[in-house]
């Protein structure tokens, strides 16, 4: 029975539209934890995460691959309110950061 439930979940996930959120954030310990925790508390799964330091390590660029669901707009508004989030940009699912990484999977 569990096997069928797993297959159904994968099918639902596969049918969902994906998108990429590009965040510019302050670079210090705990920032990624705060952002991931916000998604987790709202039962929102992050399908992919890439984070690299920029501007001499003072800030970081973070890309989050997520399912485009109705509640995403509300989650984005809450992410924007975090003090360490300096900017956020939405991209469609074909963003090169994740399409390039798919070659390694």
Task: Describe each model-derived feature in a short phrase.
Residues 1-105:
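A conserved regulatory-domain signal marking ACT and ACT-like small-molecule sensing domains
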